[in-house]
């Protein structure tokens, strides 16, 4: 897939006016955004996400490194040429940034008017875009007459007015309720699929990434610490930052508080098994427990979908009768005391799952 945006060794440093201290906003970022994809860029406040957006659309220039969009190195051309290049980059914002004194149609038409598009062509394009975002009947309304979700739809229509190849969405759903967020993300996905627009979604919400993105870049302290296919990052996050974000979106692992409550009710060993879209995975899990003579009670977990692929985890309470059986006996643990036999059977079940490639973690005792 062709690369639309290319960042190489990009850093952005600021000097504080009051102290003279150097602040590192973005540090040594190299990243490709492929044409036609939706890339989620996620990080906590202060991670450098919004600065990265301003570097991509050349509202700011990097302290070092290069930014190339659609084959043009924005860091190496005059400001006049950068302004022209920005017409190929649409932008939507958290707070909508609509003109209160203009109608909905007037807001969408504004960038076309600035670009000198003839009135008849402007009107045609505005009607087309308002129909696409489902607001054609509100063309003559004013922003204060719209809900937050409707305002963001206007923002999306305005960002698409000049038919850009690239759309930047900077925390575009952060001010919206969950239902409206899902609607706006679904609209952005339509923009990507039906119009072929490449989208970079800047967010601190991993659930938004799960719903819309093809790939995700995780930022921490100005650096991109992990990049990958969304499913791969969710199923096997490699960095602590990615692991924390995944937990907030899946809610499939017990928190320390939940774990304490589970232990009060379930005295057996608590083991969490990762669920993926592998064929027959659940049958293999059940078979491993049966072969070891282990009783498995499901006590926590959740399984969802990303791009129609299953993902999640299930936490079981594992117990075995004193004396052991199955794989535990075969491994020679039957001569131990009753408690050791039961523990050996559970160890055998866990070992069998891991040998079969199933990610299995025992929840540590409090």
State where each predicted segment sits.
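Conserved ABC ATPase signature
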Residues: 142-146, 150
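A short, proline-enriched helix->beta-strand linker immediately N-terminal to the Walker B motif
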Residues: 161-165
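ABC ATPase "signature
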Residues: 227-228, 236
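Helix-to-loop junction immediately C-terminal to a conserved catalytic motif
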Residues: 57
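A short, surface-exposed alpha-helical micro-motif characterized by mixed small hydrophobic
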Residues: 209-211
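ABC ATPase NBD coupling module
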Residues: 19-20, 74-90, 114-120, 233-237
């Amino acid at each position: 897939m062709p690369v639309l945006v290319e960042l190489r060794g990009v850093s952005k440093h600021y000097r504080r006016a009051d102290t003279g201290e150097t602040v590192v906003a973005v540090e040594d970022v190299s990243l490709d955004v492929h044409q036609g994809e939706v890339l989620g860029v996620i990080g906590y406040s202060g991670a450098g996400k919004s600065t990265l957006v301003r570097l991509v659309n050349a509202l700011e220039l990097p302290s070092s490194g290069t930014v190339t969009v659609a084959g043009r190195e924005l860091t190496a051309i005059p400001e006049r040429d950068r302004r022209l290049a920005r017409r190929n980059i649409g932008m939507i914002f958290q707070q909508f940034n609509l003109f209160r004194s203009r109608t909905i149609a007037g807001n969408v038409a504004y960038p076309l008017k600035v670009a000198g598009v003839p009135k008849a062509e402007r009107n045609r394009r505005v009607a087309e875009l308002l129909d696409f975002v489902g607001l054609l009947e509100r063309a003559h309304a004013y922003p204060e007459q719209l809900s937050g979700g409707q305002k963001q739809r206007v923002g999306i229509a305005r960002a698409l007015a000049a038919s850009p190849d690239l759309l930047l969405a900077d925390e575009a759903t952060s001010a919206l309720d969950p239902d409206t967020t899902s609607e706006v993300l679904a609209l952005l996905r339509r923009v990507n699929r039906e119009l072929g627009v490449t989208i970079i979604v800047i967010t601190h919400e991993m659930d938004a990434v799960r719903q819309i993105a093809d790939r995700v870049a995780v930022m921490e302290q100005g650096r991109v610490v992990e990049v990958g296919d969304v499913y791969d990052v969710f199923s096997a996050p490699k960095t602590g930052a990615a692991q924390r974000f995944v937990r907030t979106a899946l809610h499939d692992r017990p928190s320390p508080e939940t774990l304490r409550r589970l232990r009060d009710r379930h005295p057996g060993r608590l083991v969490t098994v990762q669920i993926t879209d592998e064929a027959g995975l659940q049958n293999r899990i059940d078979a491993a427990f049966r072969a070891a003579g282990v009783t498995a009670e499901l006590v926590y977990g959740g399984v969802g979908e990303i791009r129609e692929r299953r993902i999640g985890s299930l936490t079981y309470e594992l117990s075995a009768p004193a004396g052991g059986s199955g794989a535990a006996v075969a491994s020679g643990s039957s001569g131990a005391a009753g408690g050791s036999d039961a523990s050996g059977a559970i160890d055998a079940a866990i070992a069998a799952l891991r040998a079969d490639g199933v990610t299995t973690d025992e929840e540590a005792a409090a």
